[in-house]
Amino acid sequence: MAHVTADMPATHATEHSITVAAPQAVVYGLIADVAGWPAVFGPTVHVDVLEEADPERGGEQLLRIWATANGQVRAWTSRRVLDPAARTVLFRQTVPAAPVASMGGEWRVESAGDGTSRVVLLHDYRAVDDDPAAEELIARAVDRNSLAELAALKEAAEQGELRDELHFVFSDSETVAGDAGDVYTFLDRADLWPQRLPHVSRLDLTEDEPGVQHMDMDTRSPDGSVHNTTSIRVCFADRGLIVYKQLKVPVAMSGHTGRWEIEPLGDGTVRVTSWHTVTLDPEGVRKALGPEATPAEARALVRKALGTNSSTTLRHARRFAEEARARA
Protein backbone atom coordinates (compact mmCIF):
# COMPACT_ATOMS: atom_id res chain seq x y z
CA MET A 1 0.00 0.00 0.00
CA ALA A 2 1.39 3.39 -1.01
CA HIS A 3 1.51 6.23 1.48
CA VAL A 4 2.51 9.89 1.21
CA THR A 5 5.61 10.89 3.12
CA ALA A 6 5.24 13.73 5.58
CA ASP A 7 8.12 15.83 4.30
CA MET A 8 7.21 15.58 0.60
CA PRO A 9 3.42 15.37 0.20
CA ALA A 10 3.68 14.49 -3.50
CA THR A 11 6.19 11.68 -2.98
CA HIS A 12 4.68 8.24 -2.42
CA ALA A 13 6.44 5.28 -0.83
CA THR A 14 5.70 1.56 -0.88
CA GLU A 15 7.15 -1.52 0.79
CA HIS A 16 6.72 -5.12 -0.30
CA SER A 17 8.41 -8.17 1.20
CA ILE A 18 8.58 -11.94 0.98
CA THR A 19 10.33 -14.80 2.78
CA VAL A 20 12.46 -17.07 0.60
CA ALA A 21 13.69 -20.54 1.56
CA ALA A 22 17.15 -19.91 0.14
CA PRO A 23 20.41 -18.36 1.43
CA GLN A 24 21.01 -14.62 1.14
CA ALA A 25 23.84 -15.11 -1.36
CA VAL A 26 21.60 -16.99 -3.79
CA VAL A 27 18.79 -14.45 -3.56
CA TYR A 28 21.11 -11.47 -3.83
CA GLY A 29 22.85 -13.02 -6.84
CA LEU A 30 19.58 -13.16 -8.77
CA ILE A 31 18.86 -9.51 -7.96
CA ALA A 32 22.37 -8.37 -8.85
CA ASP A 33 22.41 -10.22 -12.20
CA VAL A 34 20.20 -7.69 -13.95
CA ALA A 35 21.04 -9.00 -17.42
CA GLY A 36 19.28 -12.20 -16.39
CA TRP A 37 16.13 -10.46 -15.20
CA PRO A 38 14.03 -11.15 -18.33
CA ALA A 39 14.42 -14.88 -17.57
CA VAL A 40 13.39 -14.42 -13.92
CA PHE A 41 10.95 -11.52 -13.68
CA GLY A 42 7.74 -11.55 -15.70
CA PRO A 43 7.46 -7.77 -16.23
CA THR A 44 11.06 -7.35 -17.49
CA VAL A 45 11.36 -7.60 -21.28
CA HIS A 46 14.97 -6.54 -21.87
CA VAL A 47 17.88 -4.86 -20.07
CA ASP A 48 20.87 -3.11 -21.64
CA VAL A 49 23.77 -2.77 -19.20
CA LEU A 50 25.37 0.54 -20.21
CA GLU A 51 27.88 0.68 -17.33
CA GLU A 52 28.76 -2.42 -15.32
CA ALA A 53 29.68 -2.74 -11.64
CA ASP A 54 32.31 -5.04 -10.17
CA PRO A 55 30.42 -8.27 -9.31
CA GLU A 56 32.44 -8.84 -6.12
CA ARG A 57 32.99 -5.32 -4.80
CA GLY A 58 29.79 -3.77 -6.09
CA GLY A 59 29.53 -0.17 -7.22
CA GLU A 60 27.37 1.65 -9.74
CA GLN A 61 25.56 0.34 -12.80
CA LEU A 62 23.79 2.27 -15.53
CA LEU A 63 20.91 0.41 -17.16
CA ARG A 64 18.30 0.84 -19.87
CA ILE A 65 15.24 -1.26 -18.98
CA TRP A 66 12.16 -2.25 -20.97
CA ALA A 67 9.30 -3.71 -18.91
CA THR A 68 5.54 -4.06 -18.96
CA ALA A 69 3.38 -1.92 -16.69
CA ASN A 70 -0.41 -2.00 -16.80
CA GLY A 71 -0.27 -3.86 -20.10
CA GLN A 72 2.06 -1.39 -21.82
CA VAL A 73 5.79 -1.50 -22.50
CA ARG A 74 7.72 1.24 -20.70
CA ALA A 75 11.42 2.05 -21.10
CA TRP A 76 13.61 4.01 -18.72
CA THR A 77 17.22 4.52 -17.70
CA SER A 78 18.24 3.65 -14.14
CA ARG A 79 21.35 3.86 -12.02
CA ARG A 80 21.91 1.12 -9.43
CA VAL A 81 24.35 0.93 -6.52
CA LEU A 82 25.26 -2.63 -5.56
CA ASP A 83 26.60 -3.52 -2.11
CA PRO A 84 27.32 -7.27 -1.98
CA ALA A 85 28.48 -7.12 1.65
CA ALA A 86 25.26 -5.51 2.87
CA ARG A 87 23.14 -7.46 0.34
CA THR A 88 21.45 -4.27 -0.87
CA VAL A 89 20.81 -2.70 -4.26
CA LEU A 90 19.78 0.95 -4.48
CA PHE A 91 18.13 2.10 -7.71
CA ARG A 92 17.01 5.42 -9.16
CA GLN A 93 15.52 6.17 -12.56
CA THR A 94 17.61 8.87 -14.23
CA VAL A 95 15.38 9.13 -17.31
CA PRO A 96 11.85 8.12 -16.22
CA ALA A 97 9.02 7.32 -18.61
CA ALA A 98 5.81 9.36 -18.32
CA PRO A 99 3.63 9.46 -16.30
CA VAL A 100 6.48 8.85 -13.81
CA ALA A 101 8.28 12.03 -12.78
CA SER A 102 10.70 10.25 -10.43
CA MET A 103 11.16 6.69 -9.23
CA GLY A 104 13.66 5.00 -6.96
CA GLY A 105 14.00 2.46 -4.22
CA GLU A 106 16.00 -0.37 -2.75
CA TRP A 107 16.29 -4.15 -2.66
CA ARG A 108 17.29 -5.56 0.74
CA VAL A 109 18.11 -9.22 1.34
CA GLU A 110 18.03 -9.94 5.08
CA SER A 111 18.73 -13.14 6.96
CA ALA A 112 15.60 -14.85 8.27
CA GLY A 113 17.54 -17.65 9.98
CA ASP A 114 17.97 -21.34 9.13
CA GLY A 115 19.27 -20.58 5.65
CA THR A 116 16.23 -18.52 4.65
CA SER A 117 16.02 -14.89 3.60
CA ARG A 118 13.61 -12.00 3.84
CA VAL A 119 13.53 -9.78 0.77
CA VAL A 120 12.28 -6.21 1.12
CA LEU A 121 11.52 -4.15 -1.98
CA LEU A 122 11.08 -0.40 -1.42
CA HIS A 123 9.84 2.19 -3.92
CA ASP A 124 9.37 5.93 -3.84
CA TYR A 125 7.82 7.81 -6.74
CA ARG A 126 6.17 10.98 -8.00
CA ALA A 127 3.81 11.46 -10.91
CA VAL A 128 4.17 14.11 -13.58
CA ASP A 129 2.38 17.28 -12.37
CA ASP A 130 1.30 15.31 -9.28
CA ASP A 131 -1.71 14.17 -11.28
CA PRO A 132 -4.00 11.99 -9.09
CA ALA A 133 -5.01 9.72 -11.98
CA ALA A 134 -1.36 9.18 -12.88
CA GLU A 135 -0.51 8.51 -9.23
CA GLU A 136 -3.16 5.80 -9.10
CA LEU A 137 -1.88 4.29 -12.35
CA ILE A 138 1.69 4.21 -11.02
CA ALA A 139 0.56 2.78 -7.67
CA ARG A 140 -1.20 -0.12 -9.40
CA ALA A 141 1.82 -0.82 -11.61
CA VAL A 142 4.27 -0.72 -8.69
CA ASP A 143 2.08 -2.98 -6.58
CA ARG A 144 1.42 -5.49 -9.36
CA ASN A 145 5.02 -5.64 -10.56
CA SER A 146 6.51 -5.78 -7.06
CA LEU A 147 4.33 -8.73 -6.07
CA ALA A 148 5.07 -10.50 -9.35
CA GLU A 149 8.82 -9.89 -9.07
CA LEU A 150 9.04 -11.08 -5.47
CA ALA A 151 7.06 -14.24 -6.26
CA ALA A 152 9.28 -14.95 -9.27
CA LEU A 153 12.43 -14.29 -7.24
CA LYS A 154 11.23 -16.72 -4.57
CA GLU A 155 10.48 -19.41 -7.16
CA ALA A 156 13.85 -19.05 -8.90
CA ALA A 157 15.87 -18.95 -5.67
CA GLU A 158 14.10 -21.93 -4.12
CA GLN A 159 14.79 -24.11 -7.15
CA GLY A 160 18.40 -24.34 -5.97
CA GLU A 161 20.52 -26.75 -7.98
CA LEU A 162 17.46 -27.86 -9.95
CA ARG A 163 17.53 -24.46 -11.65
CA ASP A 164 20.69 -25.49 -13.50
CA GLU A 165 18.68 -28.32 -15.09
CA LEU A 166 15.63 -26.20 -15.85
CA HIS A 167 17.39 -23.12 -17.23
CA PHE A 168 19.42 -23.30 -20.45
CA VAL A 169 20.66 -21.21 -23.37
CA PHE A 170 21.38 -22.23 -26.96
CA SER A 171 21.82 -20.69 -30.39
CA ASP A 172 21.70 -21.39 -34.14
CA SER A 173 23.53 -19.39 -36.82
CA GLU A 174 23.69 -18.83 -40.57
CA THR A 175 26.32 -17.04 -42.65
CA VAL A 176 24.69 -14.86 -45.29
CA ALA A 177 26.25 -13.56 -48.50
CA GLY A 178 24.00 -10.52 -48.37
CA ASP A 179 23.50 -7.17 -46.71
CA ALA A 180 22.83 -6.85 -42.99
CA GLY A 181 20.02 -4.40 -43.70
CA ASP A 182 18.13 -6.93 -45.81
CA VAL A 183 18.48 -9.61 -43.13
CA TYR A 184 17.20 -7.15 -40.54
CA THR A 185 14.25 -6.21 -42.74
CA PHE A 186 13.23 -9.85 -43.05
CA LEU A 187 13.34 -10.37 -39.29
CA ASP A 188 11.74 -7.03 -38.47
CA ARG A 189 8.78 -7.51 -40.85
CA ALA A 190 7.32 -10.40 -38.90
CA ASP A 191 3.88 -9.39 -40.12
CA LEU A 192 4.90 -10.98 -43.45
CA TRP A 193 6.10 -14.24 -41.93
CA PRO A 194 2.88 -16.17 -42.69
CA GLN A 195 3.65 -15.61 -46.39
CA ARG A 196 7.38 -16.20 -46.00
CA LEU A 197 7.78 -18.99 -43.43
CA PRO A 198 6.18 -22.44 -43.73
CA HIS A 199 5.76 -22.97 -39.99
CA VAL A 200 3.95 -19.66 -39.29
CA SER A 201 0.23 -20.02 -40.03
CA ARG A 202 -0.93 -16.69 -38.55
CA LEU A 203 0.75 -13.64 -37.06
CA ASP A 204 -0.79 -10.39 -35.84
CA LEU A 205 1.76 -7.63 -35.24
CA THR A 206 1.15 -4.21 -33.75
CA GLU A 207 3.74 -1.48 -33.20
CA ASP A 208 2.33 1.24 -30.97
CA GLU A 209 5.68 3.01 -30.91
CA PRO A 210 8.68 2.61 -33.21
CA GLY A 211 10.77 -0.40 -32.33
CA VAL A 212 8.38 -1.97 -29.81
CA GLN A 213 6.30 -4.75 -31.33
CA HIS A 214 3.53 -6.94 -29.94
CA MET A 215 3.20 -10.32 -31.68
CA ASP A 216 0.44 -12.92 -31.54
CA MET A 217 1.61 -15.94 -33.56
CA ASP A 218 0.31 -19.39 -34.45
CA THR A 219 3.06 -21.88 -35.25
CA ARG A 220 2.42 -25.16 -37.05
CA SER A 221 4.34 -28.21 -35.80
CA PRO A 222 5.48 -31.08 -38.05
CA ASP A 223 2.61 -33.23 -36.67
CA GLY A 224 0.09 -30.62 -37.81
CA SER A 225 -0.75 -29.23 -34.38
CA VAL A 226 -0.86 -25.46 -33.96
CA HIS A 227 0.64 -23.64 -30.98
CA ASN A 228 -0.11 -20.04 -30.05
CA THR A 229 2.45 -17.70 -28.49
CA THR A 230 2.38 -13.99 -27.70
CA SER A 231 5.55 -11.93 -27.49
CA ILE A 232 6.95 -8.46 -27.08
CA ARG A 233 9.89 -7.54 -29.31
CA VAL A 234 12.25 -4.57 -28.97
CA CYS A 235 14.01 -3.77 -32.23
CA PHE A 236 17.33 -1.94 -32.62
CA ALA A 237 17.87 -1.32 -36.34
CA ASP A 238 21.13 0.57 -35.77
CA ARG A 239 22.58 -2.39 -33.85
CA GLY A 240 21.24 -5.20 -36.02
CA LEU A 241 19.47 -6.60 -32.98
CA ILE A 242 15.95 -7.75 -32.14
CA VAL A 243 15.20 -9.02 -28.63
CA TYR A 244 11.97 -10.61 -27.53
CA LYS A 245 10.13 -12.10 -24.60
CA GLN A 246 7.28 -14.55 -24.88
CA LEU A 247 4.36 -13.65 -22.63
CA LYS A 248 2.46 -16.83 -23.49
CA VAL A 249 4.64 -19.93 -23.66
CA PRO A 250 4.07 -23.64 -24.35
CA VAL A 251 3.04 -25.75 -21.36
CA ALA A 252 6.50 -27.25 -20.71
CA MET A 253 8.11 -23.82 -20.23
CA SER A 254 7.79 -21.17 -17.56
CA GLY A 255 9.83 -18.62 -19.52
CA HIS A 256 11.34 -18.02 -22.95
CA THR A 257 13.35 -15.03 -24.14
CA GLY A 258 15.50 -14.65 -27.20
CA ARG A 259 17.28 -12.38 -29.61
CA TRP A 260 18.27 -12.14 -33.26
CA GLU A 261 21.80 -10.81 -33.77
CA ILE A 262 23.21 -9.66 -37.12
CA GLU A 263 27.00 -9.33 -37.24
CA PRO A 264 28.89 -8.10 -40.36
CA LEU A 265 31.99 -10.25 -40.86
CA GLY A 266 33.98 -7.77 -42.96
CA ASP A 267 34.19 -9.92 -46.08
CA GLY A 268 30.82 -9.01 -47.54
CA THR A 269 28.98 -11.59 -45.47
CA VAL A 270 27.07 -11.40 -42.21
CA ARG A 271 26.50 -13.89 -39.43
CA VAL A 272 22.92 -14.13 -38.19
CA THR A 273 22.37 -15.83 -34.84
CA SER A 274 19.18 -16.82 -33.07
CA TRP A 275 19.61 -17.09 -29.29
CA HIS A 276 17.13 -18.73 -26.93
CA THR A 277 17.01 -18.61 -23.13
CA VAL A 278 14.51 -21.12 -21.77
CA THR A 279 13.29 -22.01 -18.29
CA LEU A 280 11.35 -25.25 -18.00
CA ASP A 281 8.29 -25.67 -15.78
CA PRO A 282 8.65 -29.00 -13.89
CA GLU A 283 4.89 -29.48 -13.57
CA GLY A 284 4.37 -28.47 -17.19
CA VAL A 285 7.00 -30.98 -18.28
CA ARG A 286 5.12 -33.76 -16.49
CA LYS A 287 1.82 -32.66 -18.05
CA ALA A 288 3.27 -32.48 -21.54
CA LEU A 289 5.59 -35.49 -21.51
CA GLY A 290 4.30 -37.75 -18.75
CA PRO A 291 4.97 -38.19 -15.03
CA GLU A 292 8.33 -39.89 -15.54
CA ALA A 293 9.75 -37.24 -17.90
CA THR A 294 13.08 -35.74 -16.86
CA PRO A 295 14.35 -32.18 -17.37
CA ALA A 296 17.01 -33.55 -19.72
CA GLU A 297 14.35 -35.11 -21.96
CA ALA A 298 12.37 -31.88 -21.96
CA ARG A 299 15.46 -29.83 -22.76
CA ALA A 300 16.20 -32.01 -25.79
CA LEU A 301 12.64 -31.74 -27.11
CA VAL A 302 12.43 -27.97 -26.55
CA ARG A 303 15.87 -27.50 -28.11
CA LYS A 304 14.78 -29.44 -31.19
CA ALA A 305 11.43 -27.66 -31.57
CA LEU A 306 12.73 -24.12 -31.10
CA GLY A 307 15.93 -24.80 -33.00
CA THR A 308 14.06 -26.23 -35.98
CA ASN A 309 11.87 -23.13 -36.27
CA SER A 310 14.81 -20.77 -35.77
CA SER A 311 16.91 -22.57 -38.37
CA THR A 312 14.03 -22.40 -40.84
CA THR A 313 13.68 -18.66 -40.25
CA LEU A 314 17.44 -18.16 -40.61
CA ARG A 315 17.53 -20.04 -43.93
CA HIS A 316 14.67 -17.98 -45.34
CA ALA A 317 16.29 -14.76 -44.12
CA ARG A 318 19.51 -15.81 -45.86
CA ARG A 319 17.67 -16.54 -49.11
CA PHE A 320 15.83 -13.20 -48.91
CA ALA A 321 19.05 -11.20 -48.40
CA GLU A 322 21.08 -13.10 -50.99
CA GLU A 323 18.35 -12.73 -53.62
CA ALA A 324 18.13 -9.01 -52.83
CA ARG A 325 21.88 -8.65 -53.40
CA ALA A 326 21.66 -10.61 -56.66
CA ARG A 327 18.98 -8.22 -57.94
CA ALA A 328 20.97 -5.11 -57.00
Please state what every model-predicted region is.
Residues 3-7, 35-39, 46-99, 191-197, ...:
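Glycine-rich portal/gate segments that line the openings of hydrophobic small-molecule binding cavities
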Residues 17-19, 48, 81, 108, ...:
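Generic structural detector for well-ordered beta-strands
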